[in-house]
Amino acid sequence: MPPKGNKQAIADRRSQKQQKLQEQWDEEEESWDDSQAEEVSDEEEMESWESLDEELEDKPPKDEEEEIIASAAAPSSKEPARSQPPTGKVGPSPPRPGLLKASRRWDTVSIAGSPPAPVAPTKRSEKTTRPRKEKTSAIATRQDTPVAQELRKRIFPTLYAIFQQSRGQQLELKVKNRSLRSLTRSCLYHRREDQLQRTLEDAEALFNKYCSVSLKD
């Protein structure tokens, strides 16, 4: 068995260790409390700043306050307006002679001591001054003989019949290198009887040619 002195020493050491542990625990608790207090103070400071911002937002700016005061001091719009004498509409007064700008075109400005230059006519004035020429076609002005008129009366139905026969044809037929278009021009613009007679003969030949082609198909 160990002596009583050793037991006492061991007990003292244990008590010292427990005391040190207790002191460490106390220090940690104090530091923890301090940190908690700092956090609380930070939160309170943030809340104070937020409340200050809200107060500033709720408070109108100085300019708005001045506008509110001015609108309150101004007379109400419901008050009847003062009667004003009716004023008639006055048109714009004509410009004074001295204020008119002088033309500075080269063809209107005159040198001192020389007569003013004549104004050059514009295209619009030329168009208005020119006499209009009557548009007359060759058909309206010509004077056909009775024989020429009779030939034309026979050519036109033949040309119309050729047109009806050529509607379903893919190729354009010709007689003596004359097509339906050239025969129509000859009938409209030729005045001599022999020319119209040849046109009638060619038109009848072309009509017979179209008829023969359509019968073959």
Swiss-Prot record:
Compositionally biased region (Acidic residues): 24-68
UniProt keyword list: Host nucleus, Host-virus interaction, Late protein, mRNA processing, Phosphoprotein, Viral capsid assembly, Viral genome packaging, Viral release from host cell
Compartment(s): Host nucleus
InterPro entries: Adeno_L4-33K/L4-22K
GO cellular component: host cell nucleus
Keyword match Phosphoprotein: yes
Entry PTM: Phosphorylated in vitro by human PKA and PRKDC. PRKDC inhibits, whereas PKA activates the splicing factor.
Ranges of Basic and acidic residues composition bias in the record: 123-136
Stretches with biased composition (Low complexity): 69-78
Induction summary: Expressed in the late phase of the viral replicative cycle.
Region (Disordered): 1-142
Residue ranges of the region described as RS-repeat: 166-186
Main location class: host cell
Pfam families: Adeno_L433K_22K (PF11081)
Record region (Necessary for nuclear subcellular location): 160-187
GO biological process: mRNA processing; viral DNA genome packaging
Domain notes: The tiny Arg-Ser repeat region (RS repeat) is necessary for the splicing enhancer function.
Other facts noted in the record for this chain: All late proteins expressed from the major late promoter are produced by alternative splicing and alternative polyadenylation of the same gene giving rise to non-overlapping ORFs. Expression of packaging protein 2 and splicing factor is controlled by a L4 promoter distinct from the major late promoter.
Family statement: Belongs to the adenoviridae splicing factor family.
Entry function: Promotes alternative splicing of late transcripts by promoting splicing at weak 3' splice sites. Required for the temporal activation of major late pre-mRNA splicing at late times of infection. Induces the splicing and expression of the late capsid vertex protein.
Subunit structure: Homooligomer. Interacts with DBP; this interaction occurs at a unique vertex during genome packaging. Interacts with IVa2; this interaction occurs at a unique vertex during genome packaging and seems to potentiate IVa2 and 33K oligomerization.
Name under which the protein is recorded: Protein 33K
Organism per entry: Human adenovirus F serotype 41
Organism lineage string: Viruses, Varidnaviria, Bamfordvirae, Preplasmiviricota, Tectiliviricetes
